[in-house]
């Protein structure tokens, strides 16, 4: 399993978090990986043409960029006066509602379980809304559940970091395809045979 760049790579538990996220993305996160959100070009230009491995790498990077703004990469973080827990600040009742393995505050402070739960949530909301962070009268996609995505400055910070990653590069050549011989022959006044 190739380990993609993540924004949390400077943290001691980063490799375990990345592996947990990749495992979840290959299992219950498959609907997330299959979806090409309508706003993906602003986040990761190469995503739409990328293979599943590249798409999973994007989501790991996305989770790590979101964790910067949710918990400053602290798996044991508790916010909202004891309401939200872990790397991605998940409410235990939300975790239970989505069928996550981690359903208590204590369990959600396990980095891998928190990420697995976040992927379970996003695997429902991103395909449902076909979006990462779109506001068409109400917030859609990941932004429906995670507040940092409602901040233009935080979205810009996350998207800028993600666009700089190798897994977000466009992998197909922008060079135009050659025209079929039959079209070139017709254009020069001769009929193709």
Task: Annotate each language-model stretch with its function.
Residues 1-41, 100-193:
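Non-catalytic cell-wall polysaccharide-engagement segments
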Residues 8, 53-57, 82, 109:
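Short, solvent-exposed segments of well-ordered alpha helices
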Residues 16, 58-61, 82-85, 113:
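Short, well-structured alpha-helical interface segments that form or flank functional binding sites
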Residues 39-48, 54-74, 118:
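Short, functionally critical alpha-helical segments immediately adjacent to catalytic or ligand/cofactor-binding
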Residues 61, 89-93, 117:
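Generic alpha-helical secondary structure signal
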Residues 68-73, 93-97, 121-124:
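Amphipathic alpha-helical interaction surfaces
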Residues 76-81:
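Short, solvent-exposed loop/turn and secondary-structure capping segments
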Residues 82-101:
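Substrate-binding/active-site groove segments that recognize
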């Amino acid at each position: 399993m190739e380990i993609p760049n993540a924004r949390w790579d400077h943290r001691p538990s980063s490799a375990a978090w990345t592996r947990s996220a990749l495992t979840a993305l290959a299992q219950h996160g498959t609907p997330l990986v299959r979806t090409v959100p309508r706003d993906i070009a602003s986040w990761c230009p190469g995503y739409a043409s990328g293979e599943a491995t590249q798409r999973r790498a994007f989501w790991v990077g996305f989770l790590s960029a979101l964790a910067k703004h949710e918990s400053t990469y602290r798996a044991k973080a508790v916010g909202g006066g004891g309401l939200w827990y872990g790397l991605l600040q998940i409410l235990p009742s939300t975790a239970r509602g989505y069928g996550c393995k981690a359903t208590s505050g204590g369990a959600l402070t396990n980095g891998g379980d928190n990420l697995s739960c976040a992927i379970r949530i996003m695997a429902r909301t991103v395909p449902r809304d076909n979006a990462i962070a779109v506001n068409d009268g109400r917030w859609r996609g990941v932004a429906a559940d995670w507040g940092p995505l409602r901040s233009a400055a935080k979205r810009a910070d996350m998207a800028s970091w993600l666009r700089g990653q190798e897994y977000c590069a466009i992998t197909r050549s922008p060079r135009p395809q050659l025209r079929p011989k039959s079209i070139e022959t017709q254009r020069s006044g001769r009929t193709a045979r």
